[in-house]
């Protein structure tokens, strides 16, 4: 794996005007926000896992046919503590932070004691989500940080959500210490309050509980990164990749990162929980299959009395192991890549990840989805458009380039599902080739423009487009 993934990124706090080739559609006005890890060492200390790096927020702003780029590190509590100490002092997924060497034995003992049940980081590296009119950096932790989508400034601390046609946001979390027992919690955040006074109240203060689902295994909550939603149902996959709570409570004392507290049981089952969006009631029928690992689902919809749920799955959890930095530094040709499990479309010799759709079709029957094709040996990354009807795909690639998650933006008044553009941030292995924002015609997957920026751009994970 190339060093461009795990080298320290740099901020570009002021907007940089991009050099254009091709023509940006005149209707494309707004900002593409991106999020991902961008700082992998602080002082003399370094992180162990790619998902540990400090969050770096990026934006590409489209205005009157021009494109402007800027980036800033998320000023989370974790970032502030680490930079103030000039070392890693907050534990992350794959990196355990220890007491300062200068502390005496009593201070160290107290630190171990208070970390028995760890207060997790607020380093939100995964995504950008919208609650009402507010935008937040988020990840698989209990805290989120609000950001200003224009300046990228961090407003303050307050995972893959869904939005319905009314603009409401749906998300889920866990309540491990609930009085009625540990459970998964699904909630809704209304879009905009109707009253003048209510409209100034942050959307998160109006959160509505939809339902709670008890853990299948009391001391082993399932890992989840996304869930599905149709017109009438929410679908949650309780998979066999689980967090060992007992091991977690002793992890700090034993010197184990919480990433090592995840365990996969190939002999376990995978449960599908189907919840009525209106009533919050969980379907009485139990749906289950063999064990697998899932990070992203593509889409879900209802057809002929059935719920169709399209997933990207793996036979084990080795995908996470692949992103330990010691593994990323290995030669790509010798790396034992994760095997892909079930796939919707045959013919792929590489993994397909970071799927996206025309969000107008979220929860509805759809035809196309877009994703990143990852092939570690040789390292040729591509983005692809998949036709689920014909079971064919078309792709874009360029030598020495790594495109990020493709984001679909629909044309104004679009009728066809694929009438719009695809946006992808692209970095290169070649230091002489500047990073650029790629704009593709979503129908043909042909390049119509690129916006090259003469500054450092880092690889990211997820994001969204804000129309203006």
Task: Name each model feature, range by range.
Residues 1-468:
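Beta-propeller domains
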């Amino acid at each position: 794996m190339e060093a461009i993934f795990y080298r320290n990124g740099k901020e570009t706090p002021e907007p940089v005007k991009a050099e254009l080739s091709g023509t940006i559609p005149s209707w494309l006005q707004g900002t593409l926000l991106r999020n991902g890890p961008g700082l992998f060492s602080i002082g003399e200390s370094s992180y162990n896992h790619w998902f540990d790096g400090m969050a770096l927020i990026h934006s590409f702003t489209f205005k009157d046919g021009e494109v402007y780029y800027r980036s800033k590190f998320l000023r989370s509590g974790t970032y502030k503590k680490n930079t103030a100490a000039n070392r890693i002092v907050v534990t992350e997924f794959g990196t355990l932070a220890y007491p300062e060497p200068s502390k005496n034995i009593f201070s160290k003992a107290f630190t171990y004691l208070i970390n028995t049940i760890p207060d997790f980081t607020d380093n939100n590296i995964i995504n950008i989500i919208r609650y009402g009119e507010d935008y937040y950096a988020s990840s698989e932790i209990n805290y989120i940080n609000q950001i200003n989508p224009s300046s990228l400034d961090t407003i303050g601390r307050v995972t893959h959500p869904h939005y319905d046609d009314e603009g409401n946001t749906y998300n889920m979390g866990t309540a491990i210490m609930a009085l009625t027992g540990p459970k998964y919690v699904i909630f809704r955040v209304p879009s905009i309050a109707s009253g003048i006074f209510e409209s100034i109240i942050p959307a998160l203060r109006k959160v509505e509980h939809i339902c709670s689902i008890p853990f299948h295994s009391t001391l082993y909550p399932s890992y989840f990164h996304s869930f599905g939603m149709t017109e009438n149902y929410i679908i949650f996959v309780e998979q066999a990749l689980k967090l060992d709570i007992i091991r977690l409570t002793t992890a700090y004392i034993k010197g184990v990162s919480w990433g090592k507290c995840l365990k996969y049981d190939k002999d376990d089952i995978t449960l599908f929980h189907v919840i009525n969006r209106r009533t919050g009631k969980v379907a009485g029928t139990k749906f289950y299959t063999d064990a697998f690992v899932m990070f992203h689902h593509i889409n879900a919809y209802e057809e002929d009395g059935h719920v169709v749920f399209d997933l990207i799955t793996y036979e084990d959890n080795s995908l996470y192991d692949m992103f330990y930095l010691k593994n990323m530094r290995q030669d790509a040709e010798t790396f034992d890549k994760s095997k892909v499990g079930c796939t919707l479309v045959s013919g792929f010799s590489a993994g397909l990840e970071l799927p996206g759709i025309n969000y107008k079709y979220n929860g509805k029957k759809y035809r196309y989805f877009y994703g990143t094709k990852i092939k570690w040996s040789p390292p040729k990354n591509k983005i692809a458009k998949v036709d689920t009807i014909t079971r064919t795909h078309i792709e874009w690639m360029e030598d020495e380039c790594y495109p990020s998650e493709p984001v679909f933006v629909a044309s104004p008044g679009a009728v066809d599902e694929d009438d719009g553009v695809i946006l992808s941030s692209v970095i290169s292995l070649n230091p002489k080739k500047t990073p650029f924002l790629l704009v593709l015609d979503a129908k043909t997957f042909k390049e119509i423009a690129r916006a090259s920026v003469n500054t450092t751009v880092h690889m990211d994970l997820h994001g969204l487009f804000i129309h203006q």
